[in-house]
Curated annotation (Swiss-Prot):
It comes from Bothrops pauloensis. Belongs to the phospholipase A2 family. Group II subfamily. K49 sub-subfamily. The keyword Disulfide bond applies. Expressed by the venom gland. Gene3D superfamilies: Phospholipase A2 domain (1.20.90.10). This is Basic phospholipase A2 homolog BnSP-7. The keyword Repeat does not apply. The record marks 105, 108 as: Important residue of the cationic membrane-docking site (MDoS). Snake venom phospholipase A2 (PLA2) that lacks enzymatic activity. Is myotoxic and displays edema-inducing activity. Displays bactericidal activity and promotes the blockage of the neuromuscular contraction of the chick biventer cervicis muscle. Also disrupts artificial membranes, and provokes tissue damages characterized by edema, necrosis and inflammation. May act as pro-inflammatory mediators, inducing metalloproteinase and cytokine production from the inflammatory and satellite cells.
Amino acid sequence: SLFELGKMILQETGKNPAKSYGAYGCNCGVLGRGQPKDATDRCCYVHKCCYKKLTGCDPKKDRYSYSWKDKTIVCGENNPCLKELCECDKAVAICLRENLGTYNKKYRYHLKPFCKKADPC
């Protein structure tokens, strides 16, 4: 769910997920879509593509379990869809951490109408 995703992003990046990524670039946030603006925005694009592959669960609502061991996210689910959902969220959180150097405040509240159509997943 969005709750676990936000928690993972906070743990990995140290940033407030809603404030820092809720409307970042063309792809971060609920309404995001379009050609990525930078590596940070590309993380969100790849995350949306990961969600599109899920069948049998709702990425925004369905809760899953994970643990934070030695600064590492460990997904722990028996349900295959929830396990994949957790892995999608884990991947974006790690990607955002790895690309903290590309984070650009000018894209924090980027207006989505200015986004060009992105390549399909």
